[in-house]
Amino acid sequence: MAKYHFIIIGSGWRALYYVRVAKALPEIFCIDAMYCRTQEKADLIAGQYQIHTTTSIEECVAYKPDFAVVAVKKDAICDVSMEWLDRGITVLSETPAALDTDSLNKLYSYYKCGKKQVVAEQYR
């Protein structure tokens, strides 16, 4: 079985759950990169978790991942998800997918165009 290659957008506690899942199941998942907004955060995460981190969106896209995990602040998750859908990348986003009906309808329009987004919920 081929591994699923993915990138992670975000570096908070929810994003780090996906790092732990990938490390627990290396025969199934491979993290190509974690996108961080600052180099300081990227260096910190890379050192703590021994994964590749970057501040370059272009680098993340160049990996041609099977999907992108979007685990950012809830007020940004819809817009960030749409940015990655616009790049042609399937999105696995954390909840909430959107904060209002208009934003949810925008996400639905991506589905109608054949773009894929899956929403996940995790509990501590």
Task: List each model region and its residues.
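Beta-loop-alpha module in the N-terminal Rossmann-like domain of NAD(P)-dependent dehydrogenases
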Residues: 49-110
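Short, Asp-centered acidic motifs that coordinate Mg2+ and/or phosphate
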Residues: 33, 66-67, 116
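General small-molecule cofactor/ligand-binding pocket signal
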Residues: 32, 52-54, 118
